[in-house]
Regions:
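Conserved catalytic motifs of ABC-family nucleotide-binding domains
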Residues: 50
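Hydrophobic anchor residue at the start of the ABC signature
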Residues: 43
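Conserved ABC ATPase "signature" region
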Residues: 7-24
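A short, surface-exposed alpha-helical micro-motif characterized by mixed small hydrophobic
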Residues: 96-98
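Conserved ABC ATPase signature
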Residues: 29-33, 37
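Catalytic Walker B motif of ABC-type/P-loop ATPase nucleotide-binding domains
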Residues: 54-57
Length: 175
């Protein structure tokens, strides 16, 4: 990368701080780190290179809910602060629904869908047909639609489902 030691040190410390690692953790053997700390070290190592496009494959796999949310919050912050593209490869549609503004669905090396979370999850039946899951809240909305309680099931967040149900309660159409 052609960087001097001072710049490398600055980037490493900045990336470590960014992902929530303390200075004393940087000196530890990888065998002394927890799974979440190892994941943060790996992400910090890539962030230190300041890529314009950051591609992460299952970055939260094996982490507890708190660790998953911390990593995802850091990635959202990275995207927001740097303006760089972050691509998440994941089978967790719950995480995807809450953390991205665009979804590309691939199956057998072919692009099946490309759109906003709302656009993609409005095609929940197709996602299920190709073996992908949908957010639990979408499944609830699908069941409510089957029972005639919702006009459509293109819901992917709890807040949106609550909004629609409250609109129904108030006598307004929820579609």
């Amino acid at each position: 990368m052609g960087l001097d030691e001072k710049e490398i040190d600055r980037r490493v410390r900045s990336a470590a701080y960014f992902v929530g690692l303390r200075d004393d953790q940087l000196d530890k053997s990888p065998f002394e780190l927890s799974g979440g700390q190892k994941r943060r070290v790996a992400i910090a190592g890539v962030i230190a290179m300041e890529p314009k496009v950051l591609i992460l494959d299952e970055p939260t796999a094996g982490l507890d809910p708190r660790g998953r949310e911390a990593i995802l919050a850091q990635l959202r912050s990275y995207h927001k602060q740097k303006g760089n593209t972050v691509i998440l490869v994941s089978h967790s549609m719950e995480e995807i629904a809450r953390n991205v503004d665009r979804i590309v669905v691939m199956s057998h090396s072919h692009k099946l869908m490309d759109g906003t979370p709302e656009e993609v999850f409005s095609r929940a039946d197709e996602l299920l047909q190709v073996g992908l899951d949908v957010p639990q809240v979408t499944k609830v909305a699908m069941e409510l639609q089957k029972r005639g309680l919702l006009a459509d099931s293109s819901v992917y967040t709890i807040d949106e489902l609550v909004r629609r149900l409250l609109a129904l309660k108030g006598g307004e159409a929820a579609c």
